[in-house]
Amino acid sequence: MYFKNIIGQKNIIKQLNLLFENNQVPHSQIFIDRYNSGGLPIALDYSLLLLNNQHKTNLNQKIEIKRNYFEHPDLNFIFPLPGPKNTISEFLSPWFEFLKSKKYHPVEDWLNHIESGNKQGIISVEVIKELNKSLRLKSFSGGKKICIIWGAEKLNELASNKLLKLIEEPPSLTYFLIISKNEKKLLPTLKSRCQVIRIPPTKNEDIKSYYTEVGIENNKQAYLINASMGSSSRAIKLSEDEKNTIKLEEMLIKCLRLSFSAQKT
């Protein structure tokens, strides 16, 4: 059930499963997703694995988590916002929409999704302060709490230092899953407090399997795989473009046939 819809990344998934099975999950991990090849989707499924396997979680809670786990009350999200005065709560609704269909997409697509204009996005110190308050509250299930911080390269200096302090003195049973595309923009001391997992480019054979699964014709796959350049995000976008092109061609053919039939009558 877990990691079922991840494109490739079998070694990363194996590593995470082993950490869980051996009860060695560190309380803070950084996923470097330089190629947009699954950092956020992997973190989401990893959260499901952690939240859905607690001795205090009953069957009904498990079913609910399976259905809509990214809205679980013990799962907290931090993501880039248009400006320092914005709050996470005011963008949760579009965020959940984004997760349903675009979780492989990069930060830039998220900022476009919320129509941020030319703003580059920021994770401010006020956002981390609010996170700190939230994590100090008792968990809904009486067990673990998880925080996914996506687009961590957008943390400003004050926010980075505040997060560092939170990670150094975490609330009990709290886990931080931090995702960043740009490792160089992360605070070195923050990295030193976390287990760093670097997500490699998605293998061509895994992208090919994905294209076959979504119905891309074999004779078009090689070009699209090369154009994907190891990025799952780019591979998905290219498949969507290809499907849209096919639909347009089908509509054009249908219109031409209707026009031809009308001329005959």
Where are these predicted regions, by residue range?
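Conserved catalytic/switch belt of AAA+ P-loop NTPases
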Residues: R136, N161-S172
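Residues immediately C-terminal
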Residues: K154, E169, K185
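Clamp-loader machinery-focused feature within the broader ASCE/P-loop NTPase space
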Residues: Y2-K154, L158
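Loop/turn-to-beta-strand initiation segments
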Residues: S141-I146, P171-L177
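Conserved adenine-binding aromatic site and its adjacent loop/helix in ATP-hydrolyzing domains
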Residues: K133, K165, S192
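Charged, glycine-rich active-site and insertion segments that engage polyanionic ligands
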Residues: M1-Y69, S172-Y175, K181-T265
